[in-house]
Amino acid sequence: MGILLGILAATVWGIAGVAGGLAARLVGPTRAIAWAMMLGMVVAVPLALASGAPGRIDVRTGLWILLISACMLAGLVCVYAGMRYGSISVVAPISATYGGVAALIAIVAGDPVTGLAIGALSLAVVGAVLAARGETATPGAAYSNQRVAAVLGAGAAVVWGVQLWAGGQIQDDLGASWLVASARMIGVLVIALPLLLRGGLRVERRALPYLLVAGVGEVCGFTLYLFDTEYGIAQAAVLTGQYGTVAALIGIFILKERLQFTQIIGLVLIVIAVIGLALA
């Protein structure tokens, strides 16, 4: 059951990421994130309420929540913008290496480091460099700058790594469900509300399905991940960390993104690195 939940979480997250990227191509990253936050909040808040009252809430917890929310939003901006500049099958796997950034922060903070973690981090860097080389071809689509897209994917990995590490500092105090709901409520206040006041939330009707899948899918994916951790955190991390692989497969086989050989090698190395980081 744990393996099934992990695969489902990775699949839902991967689909949500692709949907968000496609929505950003239609309406722009900012509006895509605003809608994703609003739709995600509709799901996240009831789930948080169903989980019971939140844990300790004080100034320290509030500051951590602000940091986590800022990192979540910055990561989404990077990913959605990256998917406008370049291919989904390159940006998503690079962004999925955020576990390596969290590991680096933990090392700096004084946590012990394993040889597997160092090796996986090195592999992730090599894979990201290879994935960024060359141009991706897609029938009917033109990418303005694949290298910029790869850099934005790496930027998402950095800020999401900080988010992952920061979440570990207060998850037991606040509760994972409330952490997810709080981040989305802040996202609505910071991004969606200002856009609404300026009349900037209007989107094309054809973008709505993508926005719905992106917003709801992200929350549902995290919920599946929480259930999966009951069967083992390491197993859950390995399986759900492959959301980038799912997104890449969608990009290659459904969106018909054509990668060069070096990029494919890079993606394979990233997949191996993500597994190694989850096991380290």
Language-model-detected regions and their locations in the chain:
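Specific alpha-helical transmembrane segments that line the substrate/conduction pathway
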Residues: 9, 65-73, 80-128, 178-186, ...
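Membrane-interface interhelical linkers
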Residues: 1-10, 19-20, 25-30, 34-65, ...
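Juxtamembrane helix-loop-helix junctions in multi-pass membrane proteins
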Residues: 11-39, 53-54, 159-186, 235-238
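Hydrophobic transmembrane alpha-helices of multi-pass small-molecule transport proteins
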Residues: 101-106, 116-135, 263-279
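Hydrophobic/small/kink-forming positions within alpha-helical transmembrane segments
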Residues: 11-14, 18, 45, 69-77, ...
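Hydrophobic alpha-helical transmembrane segments in multi-pass integral membrane proteins
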Residues: 44-54, 102-117, 158-174, 218-236, ...
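Interfacial loop-to-transmembrane junctions
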Residues: 249-271
